[in-house]
Amino acid sequence: MVIDGKPHGPHKGVATCQTYMRSFSNGDEIVIEPWRAKAFPIVKDLVCDRKSFDRIQQAGGFISVRTGSAPDANSVPVPKENSDLAMDAAQCIGCGACVAACKNASAMLFVAAKVSHLGLVPQGQPERYKRVKAMVDQMDTEGFGACTVTGSCEAVCPKEISLDFIARMNRDYAVSLIQGDPKQVAGGGAG
């Protein structure tokens, strides 16, 4: 929800559901609105439909290749920096504040967080580029706007997800475009 014109309200790093009424003065008039974005249609009152985020997640926000059983996970080394970054990205709660704050209603911060938290660990590597392509394509299909990197999304994110994840996702997306779809490349070309 938007409280007094700010996604999630007046406090940085705090979601609406964690905002206490005691943070407002007695007698204050508070204006509460739903998120406003084409991809988040209003259902009624303060309820908006965020199923577009679910469809983006379903497009590739998972690991489907066999990566070993539970004991095997302990034998796969994950560099500390990657582990920390993956955990930072995994904090995204998919609330939609990034979309609500963006002048273009872009979902890049959400998608970047979901792509990065899987792409930074060894288990996510086999599908890394396929995942980013599928999720960005689904984001575009859902009608979210283009990112112009103004940073308004980062400023209102209750989990303080960094814009750096968008840069990381853009690099992975560029690689996915260069690599192309192996099915389309096979048998073609000038060779």
Q: Which residue ranges define each predicted feature?
A:
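A surface-exposed, charged beta-strand/loop segment in the N-terminal or early-internal portion
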Residues: 12-40
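Ferredoxin-type iron-sulfur electron-transfer modules in oxidoreductases and energy-metabolism complexes
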Residues: 32-38, 42-91, 95-191
